[in-house]
């Protein structure tokens, strides 16, 4: 039990101040365009100030067509950089490490949410998903 409060060293990068990590939670707090909201910023930085050694965001979609749920954090456009940089700095200010969970909902992206058919690793007749290709 005492080891929970000891630093955790990694081969590369900074050490965690302790072994407590905030798991990525689905909190539905971001703006419709994926920009971090003030509410989500406050919620996550409160976890850092509360003593977590690492604070991880919710699943952040890496492509607009990969959004899985309303209020999901985005990390696919320059418009997201300011909020994410501000969040990382605030988390580090409290001595915690900041981490983003990367996510793409694939064929589970709701068509009404993404405004079209979902993208997937391969075509799927049942859902109308089409394979991602970059030709």
What spans do the regions from the language model cover?
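Conserved small/polar residues in nucleotide/adenosyl-binding loops
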Residues: 135
């Amino acid at each position: 039990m005492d080891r929970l409060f000891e630093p955790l060293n990694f081969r590369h990068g900074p050490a965690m101040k302790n072994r407590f990590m905030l798991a990525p939670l689905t909190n539905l707090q971001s703006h419709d365009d994926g920009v971090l909201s003030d509410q989500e910023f406050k919620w996550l930085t409160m976890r850092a100030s509360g003593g977590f050694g690492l604070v991880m965001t919710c699943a952040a979609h890496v492509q607009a067509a990969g959004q899985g749920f309303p209020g999901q954090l985005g990390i696919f456009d320059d418009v997201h950089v300011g909020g994410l940089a501000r969040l990382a700095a605030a988390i580090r200010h409290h001595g915690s490490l900041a981490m983003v969970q990367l996510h793409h909902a694939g064929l589970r992206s709701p068509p009404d949410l993404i405004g079209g058919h979902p993208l997937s690793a391969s075509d799927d007749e049942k859902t109308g998903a089409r394979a991602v290709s970059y030709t």
